[in-house]
Swiss-Prot record:
Protein name: Ubiquitin-like protein 4A-B
One GO MF term attached to the UniProt entry: protein-folding chaperone binding
Coiled-coil segments on the chain, per record: none
Subunit and interaction comment: Component of the BAT3 complex.
Amino acid sequence: MILTIKPLKGKECNVQVTEDEKVSMVKELVSERLNIPANQQRLLYKGKALADEYRLSDYSIGPEAKLNLVVRPAGERSGMASSSSAVSGVWQTLSTVLAKHFSPADAAKVHEQLIKDYERSLRQLSLDDIERLAGRLLHPDSEGMDTSYMD
């Protein structure tokens, strides 16, 4: 199938892939065509960011789909390091709590399932969801904002 990749700025390109192709491979093909390093690319489909380790079929991406491409600045990844260490600290704390209440084998299973559920929930957030959440967190006293999604 042929996918159209549309950068926010610049010309779009087409890539030939299969439904079973991983997102990381699509990024490599885009890198060859547009000279944008794969680690600086963020591909979006219907407003949702695509994770490298998933296949196109996992997102129900079919023939002639159009993916949006956001190019990250070269040094942006370093800013996420402190955020990821905070997240790993949360998972470490969770492991400690689970160890107090479950056997080691059960604690590991619960921990693994919680991580999967968390990551699945994040993948399902659209850009609109993230924008509303950010607005609510940045302006908690705003009366006119739609807060129905927070229930």
